[in-house]
């Protein structure tokens, strides 16, 4: 930041104010000066220190998300959709991969929360007691996905596999089918 300020002959504080301004209505610097600062930052390859910004603003601009598998198109599609929706709102996803392991999920929740995310999205509703404690104490929005939970930590976005299969079996039974089987994969242990 000091190099940008020196090149433009302005104070570091002016550069800081221009870079931290996220709203056009905020006029701590003129728009013309802000554009000069942004151009100079781009020319010099200056990258904003998000750690410092998080410290001063108390906003990280990230949403933590934990998924069980990267090689499952359902979860990779979820991560892609979440990323696209958040990006449109100026937020970024910090993605963790649990490999269907609850102890790994708890470790990742602790690690993600240490980054001070704006929210955390976890897959499923089965968590260790320690993970549930961390999520409840986080002080940020918690979203559990892919299940309809009787006792969610906070928010749930999902569906009930049991209800969906029940509806399917009832429909098939209603059409006269009696020998019904289900074949499905299970995560490797």
Language-model features: where?
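Short, basic/glycine-rich phosphate-binding loops at helix/coil junctions
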Residues: 17, 31, 146, 179-181
């Amino acid at each position: 930041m000091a190099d940008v300020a020196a090149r433009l002959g302005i104070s570091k504080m002016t550069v800081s104010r221009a870079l931290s301004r996220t709203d056009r209505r905020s006029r701590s610097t003129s728009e013309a000066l802000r554009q000069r600062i942004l151009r100079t930052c781009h020319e010099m390859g200056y990258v904003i220190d998000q750690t410092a910004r998080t410290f001063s603003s108390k906003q990280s601009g990230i949403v933590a998300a934990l998924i069980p598998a990267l090689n499952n198109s359902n979860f990779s599609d979820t991560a892609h959709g979440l990323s696209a929706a958040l990006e449109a709102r100026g937020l970024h996803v910090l993605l963790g991969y649990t490999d269907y392991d609850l102890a790994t999920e708890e470790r990742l929740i602790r690690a993600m929360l240490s980054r001070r995310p704006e929210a955390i999205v976890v897959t499923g509703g089965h968590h260790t007691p320690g993970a549930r404690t961390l999520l409840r104490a986080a002080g940020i929005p918690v979203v559990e996905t892919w299940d309809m939970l009787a006792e969610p930590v906070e928010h749930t976005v999902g569906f009930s596999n049991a209800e969906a299969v029940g509806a399917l079996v009832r429909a098939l039974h209603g059409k006269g089918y009696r020998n019904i089987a289900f074949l499905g994969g299970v995560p490797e242990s």
